[in-house]
Amino acid sequence: MTPAEMLSRELTEKVDALRAADKPFAFATIVRTVGSTAAKPGAKALLAEDGTILEGWLGGGCARGAVKRAALTAFRTAEPQLISVTPEEFLAELGVEAGTQHGGVTYARNGCPSKGTVDIFIEPSLPLPELVVMGASPVAKALCSLAAQFQFAIRAVEADVDLLPTSRQRYVVIATQGQGDIVAFNAALASGPSLISFVGSSRKFAALSQKLMDAGADPAAVRSVKAPAGLNINAVTPDEIALSILAELVKQRRAARAEV
């Protein structure tokens, strides 16, 4: 059972609306309490992308600052967070300071008179990175089929598609193979993606890039295009080329997370 299935209908509707709008959110669940606390294990809240509580309840205001900080960390790193909001004297007994992490737990000070401890698990839900595959070539079809298993939101489009800006990560693979290459590049460059890859030889891209810059394309953006697309695995068949491209995309996505 997923967290959304354990929430009320109102909360589930809010989750669905956030997903439809490609907005990040997080579930916060109290998993353990010690001493006197307002909220008990099992209490849940839905957190917005700024870390504030949209719906639900986690007790009084003593834990809100720690929850917000942990939620922002979860969104930035795409990793769940476990926080323990603990009275200062208990932190001293444990030999940890507020703000430090030990054993996978981030500790925060609870200054409330109740002197209780609340452990809260925060699980982020981020929009899947978008993979836009331009063209209907065999490589394009193989890439769409293979990438579906690797947590990408896939869009298979024609070369003349209008790519609207998006807040999520976007990777564009141009696999038009001579059928509207320039049109596809103009659409891809205008959308400001995290990466543009071109399925074609470096010689062919050199000719296309000159045409693009002569027509007014930003030289820096053109030079940032990865051509030929994919890691060098001596790929020959469309499936092998698609595999090399997907490996490069996964490497790029993981590198982006490691930088935060």
Cite the ranges covered by each PLM segment.
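Segments forming oxygen-rich coordination pockets for charged ligands
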Residues: 1-171, 204, 210-213, 248-260
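Adenosine-phosphate binding glycine-rich loop
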Residues: 199-260
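Short glycine-rich or small-residue beta-strand-to-loop segments that form or flank ligand, phosphate
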Residues: 28-29, 53-54, 195-196, 228-230
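A generic structural signal for alpha->beta connector loops
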Residues: 151, 193, 221-222
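Rossmann-like adenosine-cofactor binding region
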Residues: 164-165, 171-198, 203-207
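Glycine-rich Rossmann-fold phosphate-binding loop(s) that bind the pyrophosphate
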Residues: 136-137, 177, 234
